[in-house]
Design a protein with these regions (language model features):
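Key DNA-contact positions within bacterial/archaeal DNA-binding proteins
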Residues: 75, 127-128
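The short coil/loop that forms the "turn" connecting the two helices of the helix-turn-helix
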Residues: 72, 124-125
Length: 151
């Protein structure tokens, strides 16, 4: 290699295979401001609204809607969801949607419904997001899961 090539190589950042970069630890500014008592109270209210009232079935129910209902802002809500549930808002909704879908896919009363209809019943806006969330949570496709239980 020439001296010019060596200098260029020294100046350029080290390239990792497949453009992988070191994952940086994210620290949300709001997390340090969360009072544990308020976070616990919000946790209970979030569970009530999302799970008990089954708002997860509404494909248009956003974090903004939930924050408005809880009379807080979306950043604080997001920080509470992340700290108390260990996931972001959309993953939280998708987890409950997938659990509901698992039940409906194996329920004989819904045997006449196709996967797309079931995905709409549990609150997914489209089939692709349903398949992606289902596979992420269960480890197999909705059709594969259903076949396993219908045999």
């Amino acid at each position: 290699m020439s001296d010019l090539e060596n200098k260029k190589q020294e100046q350029s950042p080290k390239k990792r295979p497949y453009n992988l970069r070191e994952k940086k630890e994210k620290k949300a500014a709001y997390r340090s401001l969360i009072r544990p008592e308020l976070a616990d109270e919000l946790y209970d209210k979030i569970l009530n609204i999302v799970v008990v009232q089954k708002k997860y079935k509404d494909p248009d129910f956003s974090a903004k809607d939930l924050a408005k209902e809880l009379q807080t802002n979306t950043r604080y809500l997001s920080a509470v969801v992340n700290s108390r549930f260990g996931m972001n808002y959309s993953c939280l909704l998708n987890e409950y949607r997938v659990k509901d879908a698992m039940h409906l896919l194996t329920d004989k009363r819904y045997a006449d419904k196709n996967v797309e209809e079931i995905s709409a019943l549990v609150g997914f806006a489209n089939r692709q997001s349903f398949y992606a969330a289902f596979y992420k949570n269960v480890g197999e496709t909705p059709n594969g899961y259903r076949r396993k239980f219908m045999e």
